[in-house]
Amino acid sequence: MLANETNKLLLSSQQEKPNHYTYLKEFRVEQCQSFLQHKCNQHRPFVCFNWHFQNQRRRRPVRKRDGTFNYSADNYCTKYDETTGICPEGDECPYLHRTAGDTERRYHLRYYKTCMCVHDTDSRGYCVKNGLHCAFAHGMQDQRPPVYDIKELETLQNAESTLDSTNALNALDKERNLMNEDPKWQDTNYVLANYKTEPCKRPPRLCRQGYACPQYHNSKDKRRSPRKYKYRSTPCPNVKHGEEWGEPGNCEAGDNCQYCHTRTEQQFHPEIYKSTKCNDVQQAGYCPRSVFCAFAHVEPCSMDDPRENSLSASLANTSLLTRSSAPINIPNTTLSNSINDFNSGSFAVNIPSSSLTYSPTNHANLFNVDAFNYGGSNKLSNSLSATQNDSSLFFPSRIISPGFGDGLSISPSVRISELNTIRDDINSSSVGNSLFENTLNTAKNAFSLQSLQSQNNSDLGRITNELLTKNAQIHKLNGRFEDMACKLKIAELHRDKAKQEAQEWKERYDLAQIQLNLPAELRDLSIQKLKQLQSKLRTDLEEVDKVLYLENAKKCMKCEENNRTVTLEPCNHLSICNTCAESVTECPYCQVPVITTHT
């Protein structure tokens, strides 16, 4: 089984991400051309993508067809000179060269981006320790699987040797996992009290350092225990300047300072610890810091009662709050008042030997005044007139439970004579007359209003047309006025410019006259005139010096006519033009003999 997996690993070519492929193939492989011309602005601090000096040069790692690398990923060359960057065997050396920054090992196919970085990222997404070119992964999306050589693949075939081997894969990651699985570090109170408060006792090469180690390795990594020292969660102004944390030793108060001295002290302060959500968990669903993360990995629980929410939702989605049947004796309500009005005086319901039943299938109200017994025509007429435009007129359908329909149905037990009596009483009363008169008056008023409205519409249309015509004329006049104002401004600018030029020519003429007769007339001038003349001459001289300096910097140092375009070697001075480059033998700037030239 293991042999088959090994063969698959050998035969399959790993597909690299574009960014990873660029770094593996080109990082520090070529020399920086801008540095040769003294134009590279990434030299101090050295963060350039290309190498500047020979000891920074990195060889491109390649896995050969036989399954081996062109140089080892673990064994360093003993003949390589770290100062000059020269190896007697050259690029064919099968061992690692300890270049500046150990780039050959870190950016090797075997190790590049195979382990998670132990340092955080800044606001731009760069590693706070290694910067833009960090060789470790920041997040699961940035991690890549390692490329093994044939020897490691053969080692994988023997499970026992793999378990007992000291060269186990990702040994530092396994050590970190063992640390994370320690029960005491699973307790947040223990982490808050002991994280980074003691120095690490392991050798530097055997410790991942950073957040993965619960002990500190330097002063910037140290954290004062909040049990022993009382300090606030705000940074110390003597240590932190802007976004950068300086040395804690810059604070004269030392450990007795009441402010944070390191980023670790601030993030793991009891007031800030686990108070905000972890970005890695929200974005990638995974946090490489595990139990040593200072940010929260759990969503906050909702404080609302789900039973209350479900009850509110049920009441909102149904008509129980607006259409429920309620007792009719609720005091101080519209429903109660309406019922009291119907139950008092001439509004009493009196249908002997009859009963009303509510049908769930009937949704129409057969009688708008079916429960009224005529007792006083004037009072009923006034009541109907007052409530004619009121949508809240109390009909029986408003007080009946919705479970029994929106209206009333007449039970067969109700005698037809009773209904006829009610109809005759209503027709014989003034209720019908008042309703008819009100309808007639309303129609008459509507007709008169309609004729008046049509007349007003015609007048309004005529006035609107006149206003549109006047507005068009006003816009036209405004356009002409703006054109005239623009022309006037241009004329004023020309006038002012002409005045200024005339004044300058007058001053030049006066100065020329003074210079022509300068020796004879200097003694005749007043002190004020002499001071003005001196100031003018000094200003002109300074301007001449500036122009002369700029022209000398651009023009060829030999002919002083053409611009500089040719760089001389070995001095790398850009000092002559193409015309003079053919005949020059030494640099006109430093007098060094010229070997080659390039543009």
UniProtKB/Swiss-Prot annotation:
<dbReference type="Pfam" id="PF00642">
    <property type="entry name" value="zf-CCCH"/>
</dbReference>
<keyword id="KW-0963">Cytoplasm</keyword>
<feature type="modified residue" description="Phosphoserine">
    <location>
        <position position="411"/>
    </location>
</feature>
<feature type="zinc finger region" description="C3H1-type 4">
    <location>
        <begin position="230"/>
        <end position="264"/>
    </location>
</feature>
<comment type="similarity">
    <text>Belongs to the unkempt family.</text>
</comment>
<dbReference type="Pfam" id="PF23035">
    <property type="entry name" value="zf-CCCH_UNK-like_4th"/>
</dbReference>
<dbReference type="InterPro" id="IPR001841">
    <property type="entry name" value="Znf_RING"/>
</dbReference>
<keyword id="KW-0238">DNA-binding</keyword>
<dbReference type="InterPro" id="IPR040594">
    <property type="entry name" value="Unkempt_Znf"/>
</dbReference>
<dbReference type="GO" id="GO:0007476">
    <property type="term" value="P:imaginal disc-derived wing morphogenesis"/>
</dbReference>
<protein>
    <recommendedName>
        <fullName>RING finger protein unkempt</fullName>
    </recommendedName>
</protein>
<dbReference type="InterPro" id="IPR013083">
    <property type="entry name" value="Znf_RING/FYVE/PHD"/>
</dbReference>
<dbReference type="Pfam" id="PF23261">
    <property type="entry name" value="zf-CCCH_11"/>
</dbReference>
<dbReference type="GO" id="GO:0048749">
    <property type="term" value="P:compound eye development"/>
</dbReference>
<dbReference type="GO" id="GO:0002164">
    <property type="term" value="P:larval development"/>
</dbReference>
<feature type="zinc finger region" description="C3H1-type 5">
    <location>
        <begin position="272"/>
        <end position="300"/>
    </location>
</feature>
<keyword id="KW-0677">Repeat</keyword>
<dbReference type="Pfam" id="PF18384">
    <property type="entry name" value="zf_CCCH_5"/>
</dbReference>
<feature type="zinc finger region" description="RING-type">
    <location>
        <begin position="556"/>
        <end position="591"/>
    </location>
</feature>
<dbReference type="InterPro" id="IPR036855">
    <property type="entry name" value="Znf_CCCH_sf"/>
</dbReference>
<dbReference type="GO" id="GO:0050767">
    <property type="term" value="P:regulation of neurogenesis"/>
</dbReference>
<feature type="zinc finger region" description="C3H1-type 1">
    <location>
        <begin position="71"/>
        <end position="100"/>
    </location>
</feature>
<keyword id="KW-0217">Developmental protein</keyword>
<dbReference type="GO" id="GO:0005737">
    <property type="term" value="C:cytoplasm"/>
</dbReference>
<dbReference type="InterPro" id="IPR000571">
    <property type="entry name" value="Znf_CCCH"/>
</dbReference>
<dbReference type="InterPro" id="IPR045234">
    <property type="entry name" value="Unkempt-like"/>
</dbReference>
<dbReference type="Pfam" id="PF25427">
    <property type="entry name" value="zf-CCCH_UNK"/>
</dbReference>
<dbReference type="Pfam" id="PF13920">
    <property type="entry name" value="zf-C3HC4_3"/>
</dbReference>
<keyword id="KW-0597">Phosphoprotein</keyword>
<keyword id="KW-0862">Zinc</keyword>
<comment type="function">
    <text>Essential for late larval/early pupal development.</text>
</comment>
<dbReference type="GO" id="GO:0008407">
    <property type="term" value="P:chaeta morphogenesis"/>
</dbReference>
<keyword id="KW-0479">Metal-binding</keyword>
<feature type="zinc finger region" description="C3H1-type 3">
    <location>
        <begin position="194"/>
        <end position="220"/>
    </location>
</feature>
<dbReference type="GO" id="GO:0003677">
    <property type="term" value="F:DNA binding"/>
</dbReference>
<dbReference type="GO" id="GO:0030182">
    <property type="term" value="P:neuron differentiation"/>
</dbReference>
<dbReference type="GO" id="GO:0008270">
    <property type="term" value="F:zinc ion binding"/>
</dbReference>
<keyword id="KW-0863">Zinc-finger</keyword>
<feature type="zinc finger region" description="C3H1-type 2">
    <location>
        <begin position="111"/>
        <end position="141"/>
    </location>
</feature>
